[in-house]
């Protein structure tokens, strides 16, 4: 799934290159005294098609990122479970240390000779 998303972003990058190429060709053609109308039409269509593809794919990527960034565990991810487990272990260790301190304090109070 992640590889598919990366490939889609690589395709978007290629489409952006096509957008820039089409825009450059259009500007170059418009700078001529007599512009080739059919070339301008073809490049404009290519430009618009590429822009629409880029917009569509980026919107899809943003929707996906919005879904996975809502705090819900991502399908296939164990990060949340591992983090919860680690935090529980930390709390247990903290409780063990505090109980040890409490035990030593109680012993000192019950046995004032030490």
From Swiss-Prot:
Pfam families xrefs: Med11 (PF10280)
Cellular localisation: Nucleus
Coiled-coil regions listed in the entry: 28-61
Annotated keywords: Activator, Coiled coil, Nucleus, Transcription, Transcription regulation
Biological process terms in GO annotation: regulation of transcription by RNA polymerase II
GO molecular function: transcription coregulator activity
A GO cellular component entry from the record: mediator complex
Reported tissue expression: Ubiquitously expressed at early stage of development. After fertilization expressed in head region as well as in lateral line primordium.
Transcription in keyword set: yes
InterPro entries: Mediator_Med11
PANTHER family according to UniProt: MEDIATOR OF RNA POLYMERASE II TRANSCRIPTION SUBUNIT 11
Family: Belongs to the Mediator complex subunit 11 family.
Self-association and partners: Component of the Mediator complex.
Protein name stated in the entry: Mediator of RNA polymerase II transcription subunit 11
Organism: Danio rerio (Zebrafish)
Gene that encodes the chain: med11
